[in-house]
Amino acid sequence: MPRIPTSVLGKYLLSGQISRQGCVGARQITRHSALPSAAVSVANSARLLHVSSETVPPPPAQPVPLRKQLKDEAKKAKKQGKKKSKGDSQTVDGWELTVGIEIHAQLNTARKLFSPAVTSFNDEPNSHVALFDLSMPGSQPLFQKETLIPALRAALALNCDIQKLSRFDRKHYFWWDQPSGYQITQYYEPFARNGHITLLARDGISPQDGESVTIGIKQVQLEQDTAKTLAQADKVNWLDFNRVGVPLIEIITEPEMHHPRTAAVLVRKIQMLLNTVDACVSGMETGGLRADVNVSVRRTDGSNPSLGTRTEIKNLSTIKAVEDAIIAERDRQISELEAGRAIPSETRGWTLGSNETRRLRGKEGEVDYRYMPDPDIAPLVIGDDLVDHLRRSLAVSPDSELDTLIARYGLTAKDALSLINLENGSRVQYFYKVLKSVEEKLAAELTEEEMPEFKSYSTLVGNWIIHELGRLTTFKAGPLAARDLSFTPEGDCLQVPDADLAQLLYHLVRKQITGKVAKELLFAIYLNEIEGGITQAIEDNDLWFKEIPEEEYEKLADEVMEGEDKVLQEFVDYKQFPQGKLMYLVGKMMRLGPTERIVPANAERVMRAKVEKLRSE
């Protein structure tokens, strides 16, 4: 590629202008109706909600999200039947792994740490830069007090002791993304110390860690982010100084983890905690949270009581990368030591999809960074009244919310954890809104005696929000399926409004529509093809459930039993009731009759009565 002209670079660096040459405009996807027309005959529209069969042109190619790439790779590996390697194990016989983690998280603030410039991640490059951000002569740091609030919430969520007095230090190094030649951090006197976080078996920790494991948090400190580097052709790098000076917290754990999976779970849980308390709403998938891991190994025979030489793996950007990088580095160190070679202290890198780490540079020590107190910034004094207020107003912890979802709402531990983790907690807010609307609609229409058991519909709502909404974006949903659903932090879904889903599930709970009709109605909502509301769509298309009468159940059961003498004999001779054979006969009833008008429980009841009668004859 030709070198980028100096004029183009100047426009970018000085005014944030980007050449739009080569941009590809997105094509618009053709719409089609998921609802049958009211003018179509009842025979074609009644009972079922059909999707139009007209040919739809394929959508334009879209970048595949990283999460989907990882899932696809895992499925492919499983399909090919790859054998587990040594690195797949959480332990290696004769060796102990020790891991410590440093997490860098961007705080949810409107201003930078030491300048009034706004924080922005999507605006034009270099459009939010103050003089101090560029270290212009004569500019001075001005601590933005509001940045302290989310930092304190994060430290409290991690059970840290807040220090009344803390100070800022300069960490010296020279690189193009740090114009001042040093980073302002809190190396000697951080604002929070001595925290801890407890990981439970349901969080997904390694089985070797038992039911729970508690990891110490050494300290939490405030610091600045660096500029964003955009690599170009011919070894040219562009810099976006919008990010320089953005407030970060660095969370440093104690080296107390001994299994790769547990370390990955720790990062995921800290990310969830920070989002819950509104300290960091941008996760690893968007670059708002990065992890560095320190890895060392030693023999378990007692020949080396002290920890081994540690290496640091920098800038891991996914949960999976944390686990995979630790496994790869552990196995590398063991191989080196078994070959009689020493492990140098160094910084290493990791590439997604790789099976080994790579050397970046020798490990820089404390002397190299020349830490010194920053003489331009006054000590940070934090009052007990502020800490007490934030502690009282802190959001419910994910563990407490998980217990509530399981005990009160009847969700499984796996579903409850998914609900909390999806969309950084926005999906669980959506769940509460939909469930509240369903409950209010039921209470308005039914007497107290008629009201169904709470858990019977709370679990239904949960299953639909976790599983049925997820199916909307899979390849099975057809060419109009989007990559992801969009949720706001308040719990609003842009594609499936909570009011529409609540109305749909209300009719399903009342057994006024079948599950199949409900699923196709949901897809119609997703495509924005419903006009006049859910109830009107059901009415216009004659989709109300009309169950067959009792005598038709009896007739279907009799027809199914004909020619099944061998199966029926098992109901006469059994020692243990053959439930599987019963469901086989019920399945034949469903296929023989009008499926959309049959209640499976009623079909099972009628068939059970008939086969039990055989034994008494």
Swiss-Prot record:
Enzyme Commission number(s): 6.3.5.-
Pfam families assigned to the protein according to its UniProt record, in alphabetical order: GatB_N, GatB_Yqey
Gene Ontology cellular component annotations, sorted alphabetically: glutamyl-tRNA(Gln) amidotransferase complex; mitochondrion
Recorded superkingdom: Eukaryota
Predominant subcellular localization, coarse grouping: mitochondrion
PROSITE patterns: GATB
Catalysed reactions, as listed in the record: L-glutamyl-tRNA(Gln) + L-glutamine + ATP + H2O = L-glutaminyl-tRNA(Gln) + L-glutamate + ADP + phosphate + H(+)
Biological processes, Gene Ontology terms: glutaminyl-tRNAGln biosynthesis via transamidation; mitochondrial translation
InterPro entries: Asn/Gln-tRNA_amidoTrfase_suB/E, Asn/Gln-tRNA_Trfase_suB/E_cat, Asn/Gln_amidotransferase, GatB, Gln-tRNA_amidoTrfase_suB_CS, Gln_synth/guanido_kin_cat_dom
GO MF annotations in UniProt: ATP binding; glutaminyl-tRNA synthase (glutamine-hydrolyzing) activity
Transit peptide, start-end: 1-56
Region Disordered, residue ranges: 53-90
Biased composition (Basic residues): 76-85
Keywords of the record: ATP-binding, Ligase, Mitochondrion, Nucleotide-binding, Protein biosynthesis, Transit peptide
Known partners and oligomeric status: Subunit of the heterotrimeric GatCAB amidotransferase (AdT) complex, composed of A, B and C subunits.
NCBIfam families to which the protein is assigned, alphabetical: gatB, PRK05477.1-2
Function per UniProt: Allows the formation of correctly charged Gln-tRNA(Gln) through the transamidation of misacylated Glu-tRNA(Gln) in the mitochondria. The reaction takes place in the presence of glutamine and ATP through an activated gamma-phospho-Glu-tRNA(Gln).
Family membership: Belongs to the GatB/GatE family. GatB subfamily.
Protein name listed in UniProt: Glutamyl-tRNA(Gln) amidotransferase subunit B, mitochondrial
Protein's organism: Fusarium vanettenii (strain ATCC MYA-4622 / CBS 123669 / FGSC 9596 / NRRL 45880 / 77-13-4)
Taxonomic lineage from the root: Eukaryota, Fungi, Dikarya, Ascomycota, Pezizomycotina
